[in-house]
């Protein structure tokens, strides 16, 4: 399984994301550059230039018309995917940590950090109403008083937002009223990443408490746990197999000149139902910060602390693999 190596960032990768069809891969890092690549051959299609700080999050809408990015330069920006033109600039008081388009691509949400004396908020903008963008006034703003949001995604059909907090809590916020619909605390430490399944019925969380967990998206009921010995930075669900991939490793600040084996910098594959690990993929020099499955399930990508993104196309053996219970 020889990976395609994407070199387009000078700093560590913060998030990677495929569009719905999977022909494009968006990558953001702790530098101000937003890159888009052809996932089939790793060719760089272009960059979205404008941010002046680390970019924490990226998302593309349903028909890949618009791209949304959130950055530590205290802004969330909307781009035209094809031309790279900046369509909107939404200023915030603190860094934008998570962002996302809803199911229809009309409403965006983003969450800001609790820093510099400012509160953590989730803001909602309707892109069909230009006055909201021009005046920088969201139609709804949810304050998070307790612990800041570290990862968030839109729930099924854009009815709610599922947010993971620094404390390990999971909240489901109504996208209509802003109230907390469900609150659970299954993790003991910060939730680094949340990714939904293809049909949006369940999602996987990755946490600093060395586990990834599977939840039901409507009830937030805890289903499965995948345990490792290191903090998990990212986890993704396969669209056509009962597989989950975990990326993690030591925290960046703890990584010294240890060998790559000691730091446990592999991507790890677990069976969804049996919670058993069945494979590992080495490669990154440093922890893996973000993983994503291609929507057709035939490949996956990982972005690391080393600033590289690797696209791995699975060998034929992967598709013939039978898990023996």
Curated annotation (Swiss-Prot):
One of its GO terms (cellular component) is eukaryotic translation initiation factor 3 complex, eIF3m. There is a cross-link at residue 282 (Glycyl lysine isopeptide (Lys-Gly) (interchain with G-Cter in ubiquitin)). The modification N6-acetyllysine is found at residue 264. InterPro entries: eIF3i, WD40/YVTN_repeat-like_dom_sf, WD40_repeat_CS, WD40_repeat_dom_sf, WD40_rpt. One of its GO terms (biological process) is formation of cytoplasmic translation initiation complex. It is found in: Cytoplasm. Phosphorylated by TGF-beta type II receptor. WD repeats lie at residues 8-47, 50-91, 144-183, 186-225, 283-324. It comes from the Eukaryota. It holds the Pfam family EIF3I. The modification Phosphothreonine is found at residue 219. Keywords: Acetylation, Cytoplasm, Initiation factor, Isopeptide bond, Phosphoprotein, Protein biosynthesis, Repeat, Ubl conjugation, WD repeat. The modification Phosphotyrosine is found at residue 308. Signal peptide: none annotated. GO terms for molecular function: translation initiation factor activity. Belongs to the eIF-3 subunit I family. Component of the eukaryotic translation initiation factor 3 (eIF-3) complex, which is required for several steps in the initiation of protein synthesis. The eIF-3 complex associates with the 40S ribosome and facilitates the recruitment of eIF-1, eIF-1A, eIF-2:GTP:methionyl-tRNAi and eIF-5 to form the 43S pre-initiation complex (43S PIC). The eIF-3 complex stimulates mRNA recruitment to the 43S PIC and scanning of the mRNA for AUG recognition. Component of the eukaryotic translation initiation factor 3 (eIF-3) complex, which is composed of 13 subunits: EIF3A, EIF3B, EIF3C, EIF3D, EIF3E, EIF3F, EIF3G, EIF3H, EIF3I, EIF3J, EIF3K, EIF3L and EIF3M. The eIF-3 complex appears to include 3 stable modules: module A is composed of EIF3A, EIF3B, EIF3G and EIF3I; module B is composed of EIF3F, EIF3H, and EIF3M; and module C is composed of EIF3C, EIF3D, EIF3E, EIF3K and EIF3L. EIF3C of module C binds EIF3B of module A and EIF3H of module B, thereby linking the three modules. EIF3J is a labile subunit that binds to the eIF-3 complex via EIF3B. PANTHER family: EUKARYOTIC TRANSLATION INITIATION FACTOR 3 SUBUNIT I (PTHR19877:SF1). This is Eukaryotic translation initiation factor 3 subunit I. The gene is Eif3i.
